[in-house]
């Protein structure tokens, strides 16, 4: 599990590497499009989730890859099979979808995030890239997503978590690459770096540390 941590906007986009190599299953690889990466089992769950709020859970789960039934040239969407799979997969991560036909817009933010992740895993993702998966979530919803990320990793899935929230990344990560204003400050194993050190290396980290010291001093000062 790798965690990319940095301040807001420092890791907003990705490009072809200026140097180095991308190795997938022991082979040097060059991706010409996102589809190339997807074909090799590398899936990305973007910050906007790519879900349609007015469409059902099932429709979002299978979007563009619907199971079909019927004779050749007259195939139709197998809604019964799709509903069953969608409900089962969501149930496996602890989310009870009583009606798979319900609109995704009725789900909580954490449930929608888990739906997007579960969809990627179901369709064969071996490497999962998550872009700010907890940025718009409350404490409880974020914990649901983080627990699912840990569960996915424990089942052999490689997870790359992109976030500016060290407090979410540190408990679930094994190694961390720190980015500051678009530049890498290095990759560290968890045993070699503390949460506080990670935070201080990020853009704005030193300012936050200074603020904490100032606030402590203010609290110690006698009231006027």
Which positions does each model-derived feature cover?
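Single conserved hydrophobic/aromatic residue that forms the stacking wall/gate
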Residues: 1-6
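Glycine-rich phosphate-binding loops of nucleotide-dependent enzymes
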Residues: 7-224
